[in-house]
Amino acid sequence: MARLSEPSPYVEFDRAQWRALRMSTPLKLTEDELVRLRGIGEKIDLLEVEEVYLPLARLIHLQVAARQALFATTADFLGEPQQNPDRPVPFVIGVAGSVAVGKSTTARVLQALLARWEHHPRVDLVTTDGFLYSNSELSRRNLMHRKGFPESYDRRGLMRFVTTVKSGSDVACAPVYSHLLYDIVPGEKQIIEHPDILILEGLNVLQTGPALMVSDLFDFSVYVDARIEDIENWYISRFLKMREGAFADPASHFHHYSTLTDEQAVFAARDIWHSINRPNLIENILPTRPRATLVLRKDSDHSINRLRLRKL
């Protein structure tokens, strides 16, 4: 592991150093399962799961146990009853990063691996897309052109949801977003029932502010990182694949893109990237990277080659 010459709260690893921390953690994920978890354009394989994600799952597993011991100590100090071992305080993980960087795949792989530990089998994954304001509300607020930026989210609703989960409520409900419709699905909810671990994945989950923010409730956080130029290329490549896939569905909000030529599609994707996604990354998402417990740094081929762990 690399230690910076100046005092630092971080410790950096190359992949070989990190994989040694897997110890004897077994791989319980099959190739078929990984295919279903892999996002569009992602190239994660079982070797990367073994060398990157298993050590990460082991670290989180250890931190879950330590966090529960801390809660028990606090309860003892307050003279409160010890928590029910069958209903521990949920451990909340935030996963952040740019559009097209692969954070959704990271979140899904983590969910699959963590759920295989017998001490925390109930692992739920929620994306913050469901907390975007509906298109009608965004239009009313004149924010459609800012969709995905922090102000386009119901941040109070998101905070209430995570607080409800973390406080041990029997049920918490999250709105559901449809990428096909490009809007919130009216009346549809994702039901969360006292999980052992909650993974919250989204662009802006690590944001801070003058008031309590959802990031203040995280027990662990991951930022998926890459060069901006690489993410742009991945976004354009994904756009071209979606033009032939999801966009081809007549019900898709983006169906009009399905008839574009390659040249037209690349132009459209690059325009969206530079007018929306790149500014959001630079202004809002990238500045939150130092807050992450762990930064996963990707190379141009999508492989994770370096990691930075916050130790303080």
UniProtKB/Swiss-Prot annotation:
Keyword annotations of the record: ATP-binding, Coenzyme A biosynthesis, Cytoplasm, Kinase, Nucleotide-binding, Transferase
Gene3D superfamilies: P-loop containing nucleotide triphosphate hydrolases
A single BP term in Gene Ontology: coenzyme A biosynthetic process
S-S pairs: none
Residues annotated as binding ATP: 97-104
Transmembrane segments: none
InterPro entries documented for this protein: P-loop_NTPase, PanK, PRK/URK
A single Gene Ontology CC term: cytoplasm
Primary location: cytoplasm
EC number in record: 2.7.1.33
Catalytic activity: (R)-pantothenate + ATP = (R)-4'-phosphopantothenate + ADP + H(+)
Source organism superkingdom: Bacteria
UniProt pathway annotation: Cofactor biosynthesis; coenzyme A biosynthesis; CoA from (R)-pantothenate: step 1/5
Listed CDD domains: PanK
EC class: transferase
Entry coiled-coil feature ranges: none
Subcellular location as annotated: Cytoplasm
Keyword Transferase in annotation: yes
GO MF entry, a single one: ATP binding
Family, per entry: Belongs to the prokaryotic pantothenate kinase family.
Record protein name field: Pantothenate kinase
Organism: Mycolicibacterium gilvum (strain PYR-GCK)
